[in-house]
Structures are given as structure tokens and as C-alpha cells.
Amino acid sequence: MAKTIVHENESIDDALRRFKRSVSRSGTLQEYRKREFYEKPSVRRKLKSEAARKRRHY
């Protein structure tokens, strides 16, 4: 979990910017979006093979 301590004489905008940067670096939001809806293992394998096929094609 990302934590941000707001320092003295620091604006909320700067603290929010630091928080967003730490969340994006830790991958928290990406992990949330990946797990938002359950995917059956068969669907996950199918998507993975389609992505590999797209990478090979280009």
C-alpha cells in the first residue's frame, strides 16, 4: 500500500502528485484493474495466446 506523508509547507497538489507517482510505480492500480472482474483460467489462457500471436505478427 502506498503511503505519502505531507510535509510542512507542501501544497496538497504536490503531495497528491507524489502519491499518484508512488501508486503508479508500485503497480497497485494496474493490479486492481486486472483483478476487478474474475477471469476463468481458460479465458485467461486464451487471452494470453492471442496476445502472443499479435506480438509475433507485428
UniProtKB/Swiss-Prot annotation:
| GO CC list | ribonucleoprotein complex; ribosome
Q: Which GO terms describe its biological process?
A: translation
GO molecular function of the protein, one example? Answer: structural constituent of ribosome
User: Is the Ribonucleoprotein keyword given for this protein?
Assistant: yes
**Which of UniProt's keywords are assigned here?**
Ribonucleoprotein, Ribosomal protein
Q: Which family does it belong to?
A: Belongs to the bacterial ribosomal protein bS21 family.
NCBIfam families, per the entry: S21p
Question: What name does this protein carry?
Answer: Small ribosomal subunit protein bS21
